[in-house]
């Protein structure tokens, strides 16, 4: 691990790692070498040829290239404490970066190389501008190579974070250069993931800048001219953005770099560019420097390049792969992934007001980053009071009253899409195909996977940048910053109201005093724009429920019920979804998006759903995108008389052409994906942010009305403290509903974006590609015909191959999964994503430790009497009936639900069957999970049934009891049966609570009268109140979600636990090979499996005898599962695949009866009906397939027999008296096999087989 040096600003100069640096011919500054080649300079950055000066009136002016700015001239200029804090903060970030694999590799790369020197026959020298100068302790002037200098923010803006190449050309052409990094660790941007907002981790953003510096150092900054250009047509409401270099997108990494990857692969490093690296390597190898330092420099370069020296020849292919590793393996996203840091989904994203924080140890550590997480709710993140931003005035005349309405909008909030110019003039031509052409196949593998798995990082694996020509040292510094021209127009006149007017109409004025005036919610946009006491809402019911109370509520209960009504109406309207099958690949339409954002309101009488169905996805676009066209030229084959006389080379040329054709299709697809991303998806992403803003405005307006009602409350004054709590909880409930709705909105928007790509853009190029295919086929046919005499018998094969692959009716399929992420997988597994997003607590076992597996690291105490045992999938928790067998979970805000906060609890539980020892507990309720003092909730057991109880602060109690009996629910639902049951309890505090077992609804009760079940008590997992001290329970995956799942989601949640192909035994645990089981039939529970020898047939016949039962009380009758006796058979399933110990669906195995051998079909020597009966035989294999023809959540399986014409399912004979025996013989039923899927499975159970292992939870 690289050693990070630690300094204080007042440490004395040592002339080695702490120096007084003279740089850019400026006054000396104190610099600290944190690792070799990287220096920290705790000063403001003021070394630039930028002629734009910071205005004196800093509070009112923002420069053209900025979105947000903070002006402060004094910071980091004279205060030693500020300088020391800056130095310590950067050091902390370096330690955090260095603690990751990627970060450590990055710092090693930077610290073990220098920009490529000037090379001649007898000399190797560094360029002067890539060095720093300082005085040694003894007064000598020292010149030393340097790679990176890290400064504080620039003089013009404290929010600056950027990397400047000291020579912009040499950063791209292979020579390489030193970099200045401008950085502020305390001012942090705010980003979004889904509907959540978070603050960037400064270690992640510093890593981003260091990667830029690495590219500059090696001279491999993206050399192409391609940029994402953003139009400046201000009359179209297009925002003003800098051009985004592909260098920026690739340095960030993530999904966006994958999208543009195929588009840039070809131009990234042309072969002649890489070949020159080999030439430079030879030049260094052949030089003969005189001075020791130069010899050492030469040897270090040779050591770094040796991995690419293959027997004296420079391996350009391997070197190019190495460059690609650096490009696609080292990026900010991969660093964030390794450190589990939240980062934005896309490089280009809406910027939100930044935050300020100190990086003290109680706020930020090297290991965890932000101790309390990155959410903007973290109180350590402060609002920046003196933040300024660039605005534009939008003016429009209303349609009804003809009033000119002007609003101020941040330019950052305007739309931005890629300019078509950035995609034009792309060369899709190809050189003539040769027999040895290097053709790459389309792949979806990750460069990062290759990078991390296949690269070993040590000094010999570094490589220096290589000059293309002998360099002439420039006389001045080149400033490489892009400063685009921006339209300075500050006011825009428009014909109609825009989305921004609608959003502004939903916003409460900053100066509005909600304690004195009521803010009315109205459904008229013009009424709102003309009256500051009104806000616009697209939600009619919500407006009615908010406005119906003028003022003067006189009772706390009435106030509470009014809050509930408002929340309920708002939530119901947010949950609106219109299912549709009229627009391809769209699951549903969110109908209020139109009226919220003024989309399509002039169409279909304001019906957004109908307008969307009629016009499609394009209705969402604020600006109609203009796409660059593609010009394709047919592939041609290089013809050479000598080569074309060789059959193998002719065939290679044809095959390479066909492979290149596939590559071309994928290249064109990738080009269209890049345009879609820059012109369509950016607009869709803006729409998502606009809806987030809209719902936020709605909540603010609703809360303002609540505060108004509180200030005008006519009841007792001592009620107001309680009412404040109600309002606080109501705001949480409103935000929860909005976040939930945003997930539906986001899905609708993302599906719309992908639909446009699949159904509009991709088809638009297919006809062009088919013409390309036809022209290419013509060239191939001519080439094959010309060389038919050489091909001989392969002529027909080659022609058939061309005809097949270039058939006009075929095309190369576009793989939607090739679009990196974009939530496609999330859309497919939306329930899983939603549950993960809402999971706030998950008690389980990991690495033999009981912990919170949700990622929230909830504090819990596990007492010594709690055991970890084998469970439903792996290890699970066992609670015993003793004082030390308990788990105490300290509650945090995430799991403290009150008033209006919905939640769901789900868990797996295995409770032993009631036996005689349990009689002393009959009629007694005892606790399993308790979070109740004077109020709260708990889960308990009574007479083998589960009890869910809620109690509010006024003592009102709601109970749900399963009320099942053993006899009618033993297999499926009864809790005390020793079988794993999945319990789900949903609590919708505005309506009801519901209890489910195994995904099926058992009971539901209204909880509308309950008023607050929150408390500060811990959640205690403990058997408390029972008399039987031998009792125990097994508990697994106890999860709490911060929303109430609906009925279909509960069913899906239960089914999600059965995605594996592993079959399960009678108890619900994995079925295992070579383990002893009793095998019982569902039709005759309690009927033991026996065998009998029939001498006249010479075989042992297995059969099931009559059911045997026993009583544990006068009202509970229980079937025997364990059977004793010399003729009772236990079985083992014998593995034929040797994969692992678990039995999976469709495994072929032997069912071995422990006494008499394998279960097989009788030999075909008796009557036809008897040939289908099963016998036991030591010498023959049964080759039975264990299958599951019903849903995966069943704890039984079917057994299929394969035997010539007697295929069937293992069943029991209808005639119990066959062979004069009192029982049911086993046979192969072809009828059941043919008809199983059409049968009433509640009646037809004879082919369902359980495997029962002996367990301490079931005693007989």
UniProtKB/Swiss-Prot annotation:
Disulfide bonds join 395-406. It holds the Pfam family Peptidase_M27. InterPro entries: Bot/tetX_LC, Clostridium_toxin_transloc, ConA-like_dom_sf, Kunitz_inhibitor_STI-like_sf, Toxin_rcpt-bd_N, Toxin_trans. Induction: Detected as an approximately 140 kDa protein in bacteria (at protein level). Part of a high-molecular weight complex with other proteins from the ptox and cry loci. Encoded in the ptox locus, possibly in an ntnh-orfX1-orfX2-orfX3-pmp1 operon. Antibodies were raised against a peptide in the heavy chain (residues 422-435). Changing residue 1229 to D: No change in toxicity when injected into A.aegypti larvae. Signal peptide: none annotated. Keywords: Disulfide bond, Hydrolase, Metal-binding, Metalloprotease, Neurotoxin, Plasmid, Protease, Toxin, Virulence, Zinc. GO terms for biological process: proteolysis. The active site is at 209 (proton acceptor). The keyword Protease applies. Residues 825-1065 are annotated as: HCN. Its cofactor is Zn(2+). Gene3D superfamilies: 2.60.120.200, 2.80.10.50, Clostridium botulinum neurotoxin b, 'coiled-coil' domain (1.20.1120.10), Metalloproteases ('zincins'), catalytic domain like (3.90.1240.10). One of its GO terms (molecular function) is zinc ion binding. It catalyses: Limited hydrolysis of proteins of the neuroexocytosis apparatus, synaptobrevins, SNAP25 or syntaxin. No detected action on small molecule substrates. Residues 1066-1260 are annotated as: HCC. Residues 401-824 are annotated as: Translocation domain (TD). Identification of mosquitocidal P.bifermentans strains in regions where mosquito-borne diseases are endemic could help control mosquito populations. No mammalian toxicity was detected. Feeding larvae with P.bifermentans strain Cbm (subsp. malaysia) is toxic to Anopheles mosquito 3rd instar larvae and less toxic to Aedes aegypti larvae. The presence of 4 plasmids, including this one, is required to kill mosquito larvae. This is Paraclostridial mosquitocidal protein 1. It comes from Paraclostridium bifermentans (Clostridium bifermentans). The gene is pmp1.
């Amino acid at each position: 691990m690289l050693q990070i040096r630690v300094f204080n600003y007042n440490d004395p100069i040592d002339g080695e790692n702490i120096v007084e640096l003279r740089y850019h011919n400026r006054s000396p500054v104190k610099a600290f070498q944190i690792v070799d080649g990287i220096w920290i300079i705790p000063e403001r950055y003021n070394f630039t040829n930028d002629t734009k000066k910071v205005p004196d009136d800093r509070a009112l002016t923002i420069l053209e290239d900025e979105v947000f700015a903070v002006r402060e001239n004094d910071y980091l200029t004279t205060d030693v404490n500020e300088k020391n804090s800056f130095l310590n903060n950067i050091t902390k970030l370096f330690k955090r970066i260095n603690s990751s694999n990627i970060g450590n590799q990055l710092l090693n790369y930077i610290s073990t190389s220098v920009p490529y020197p000037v090379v001649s026959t007898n000399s190797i020298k560094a360029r002067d501008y890539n060095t720093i100068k300082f005085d040694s302790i003894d007064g000598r002037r020292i010149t030393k190579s340097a790679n990176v200098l890290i400064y504080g923010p620039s003089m013009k803006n404290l929010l600056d974070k950027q990397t400047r190449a000291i020579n912009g050309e040499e950063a791209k052409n292979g020579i390489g250069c030193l970099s200045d990094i401008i950085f502020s660790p305390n001012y942090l941007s705010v980003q979004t993931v889904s509907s959540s907002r978070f603050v960037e981790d400064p270690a992640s953003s510093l890593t981003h800048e260091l990667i830029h510096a690495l590219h500059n150092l090696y001279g491999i900054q993206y050399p192409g001219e391609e940029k994402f250009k953003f139009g400046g047509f201000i009359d179209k409401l297009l925002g003003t953005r800098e051009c985004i270099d592909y260098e920026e997108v690739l340095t960030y990494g993530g999904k966006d770099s994958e999208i543009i990857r195929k588009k840039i692969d070809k131009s990234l490093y042309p072969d002649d560019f890489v070949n020159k690296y080999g030439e430079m390597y030879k030049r260094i190898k052949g030089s003969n420097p005189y001075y020791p330092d130069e010899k050492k420099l030469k040897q270090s370069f040779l050591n770094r390049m040796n991995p690419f020296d293959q027997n004296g020849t420079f391996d350009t292919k391997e070197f190019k792969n190495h460059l690609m590793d650096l490009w696609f393996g080292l990026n900010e996203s991969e660093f964030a992934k390794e450190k589990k840091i939240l980062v934005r989904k896309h490089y280009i994203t809406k910027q939100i007001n930044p935050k300020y924080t100190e990086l003290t140890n109680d706020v930020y550590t090297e290991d965890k980053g932000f101790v309390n997480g990155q959410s903007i709710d973290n109180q350590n993140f402060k609002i920046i009071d003196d933040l300024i931003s660039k605005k534009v005035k939008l003016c429009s005349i209303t349609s009804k009253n003809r009033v000119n309405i002007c609003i101020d909008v941040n330019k950052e909030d305007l739309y931005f899409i890629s300019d078509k110019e950035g995609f034009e003039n792309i060369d899709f031509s190809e050189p003539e195909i040769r027999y040895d052409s290097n053709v790459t196949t389309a792949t979806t593998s990750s460069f990062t996977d290759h990078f991390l798995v296949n690269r070993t990082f040590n000094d010999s694996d570094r490589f220096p940048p290589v000059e293309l020509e002998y360099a002439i040292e420039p006389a001045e510094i080149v400033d490489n910053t892009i400063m685009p021209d921006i339209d300075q127009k500050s006011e825009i006149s428009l014909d109609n109201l825009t989305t921004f007017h609608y959003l502004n109409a939903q916003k409460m004025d900053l100066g509005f005093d909600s304690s004195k005036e009521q803010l009315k919610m109205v459904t008229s946009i013009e009424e709102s724009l003309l009256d500051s006491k009104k806000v616009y809402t697209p939600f009619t019911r919500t407006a009615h429920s908010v406005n119906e109370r003028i003022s003067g509520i006189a009772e706390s209960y009435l106030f509470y019920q009014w809050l509930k009504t408002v929340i309920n109406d708002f939530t119901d309207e947010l949950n609106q979804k219109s299912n549709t099958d009229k627009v391809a690949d769209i699951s549903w339409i969110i109908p209020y998006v139109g009226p919220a954002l003024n989309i399509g309101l002039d169409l279909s009488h304001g019906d957004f759903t109908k307008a969307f169905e009629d016009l499609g996805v394009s209705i969402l676009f604020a600006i109609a995108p203009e796409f660059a066209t593609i010009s394709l030229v047919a592939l041609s084959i290089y013809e050479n008389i000598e080569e074309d006389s060789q059959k193998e080379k002719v065939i290679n040329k044809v095959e390479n052409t066909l492979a290149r054709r596939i590559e071309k299709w994928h290249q064109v697809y990738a080009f269209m994906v890049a345009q879609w991303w820059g012109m369509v998806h950016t607009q869709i992403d803006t729409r998502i942010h606009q809806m987030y803003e809209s719902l936020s405005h709605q909540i603010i307006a609703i809360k303002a009305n609540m505060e108004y009602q509180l200030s005008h409350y006519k009841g007792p004054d001592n009620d107001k403290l309680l009412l404040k709590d109600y309002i606080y909880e109501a705001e949480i409930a409103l935000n929860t509903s909005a976040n939930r709705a945003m997930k539906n909105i986001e899905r609708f928007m993302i599906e719309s974006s992908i639909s446009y790509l699949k159904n509009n853009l991709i088809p638009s190029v297919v006809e062009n590609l088919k013409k390309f295919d036809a022209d290419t086929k013509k060239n191939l046919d001519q080439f094959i015909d010309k060389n038919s005499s050489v091909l001989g018998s392969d002529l027909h094969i080659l022609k058939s191959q061309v005809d097949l692959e270039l058939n006009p009716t075929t095309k190369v399929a576009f793989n939607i999964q090739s679009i990196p992420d974009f939530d496609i997988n999330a859309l497919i597994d939306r329930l899983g994503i939603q549950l993960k997003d809402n999971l706030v607590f998950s008690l389980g076992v990991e690495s033999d430790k009981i912990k919170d597996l949700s990622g929230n690291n909830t504090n819990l105490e596990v007492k010594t009497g709690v055991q970890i045992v084998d469970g439903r999938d792996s290890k699970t928790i066992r609670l015993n009936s003793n004082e030390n067998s308990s788990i105490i979970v300290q509650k945090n805000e995430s799991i403290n639900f009150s008033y209006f906060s919905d939640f769901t609890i789900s868990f797996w539980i295995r409770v032993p069957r009631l036996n005689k020892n349990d009689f002393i507990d009959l009629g007694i309720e005892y606790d399993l999970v308790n979070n109740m003092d004077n109020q709260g909730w708990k889960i308990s057991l009574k007479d083998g049934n589960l009890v869910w109880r809620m109690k509010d602060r006024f003592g009102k109690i709601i109970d749900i009891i399963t009320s099942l009996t053993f006899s009618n629910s033993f297999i499926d639902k009864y809790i005390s049966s020793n079988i794993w049951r999945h319990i789900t309890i949903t609590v919708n505090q505005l309506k009801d609570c519901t209890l489910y077992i195994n995904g099926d609804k058992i009971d539901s009760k209204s909880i509308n009268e309950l008023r607050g079940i929150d408390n500060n008590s811990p959640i205690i997992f403990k058997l408390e109140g029972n008399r039987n001290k031998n009792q125990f329970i097994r508990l697994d995956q106890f999860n709490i979600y911060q929303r109430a799942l609906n009925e279909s989601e509960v069913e899906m949640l239960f089914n999600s636990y059965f995605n594996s192909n592993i079959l399960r035994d009678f108890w619900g645990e994995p079925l295992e090979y070579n383990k002893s089981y009793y095998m019982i039939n569902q039709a005759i529970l309690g009927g033991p499996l026996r065998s009998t020898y029939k001498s006249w047939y010479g075989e042992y016949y297995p059969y099931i005898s009559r059911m045997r039962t026993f009583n544990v009380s006068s009202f509970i009758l229980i079937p025997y599962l364990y059977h004793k006796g010399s003729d009772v058979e236990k079985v083992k399933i014998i593995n034929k695949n040797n994969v692992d110990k678990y039995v999976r669906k469709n495994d072929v195995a032997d069912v071995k009866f422990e006494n008499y051998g394998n279960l097989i079909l009788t030999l075909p020597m008796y009557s036809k009906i008897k040939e289908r009966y099963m016998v036991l035989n030591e010498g023959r294999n049964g080759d039975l397939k264990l299958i599951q023809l019903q849903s995966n959540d069943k704890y039984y399986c079917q057994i299929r027999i394969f035997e010539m014409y007697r295929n069937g399912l293992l069943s029991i004979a209808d005639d119990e008296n066959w062979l004069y025996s009192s029982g049911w013989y086993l046979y192969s039923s072809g009828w059941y096999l043919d008809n199983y899927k059409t049968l009433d499975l509640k009646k037809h159970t004879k082919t369902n087989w359980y495997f029962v292992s002996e367990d301490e939870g079931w005693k007989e």
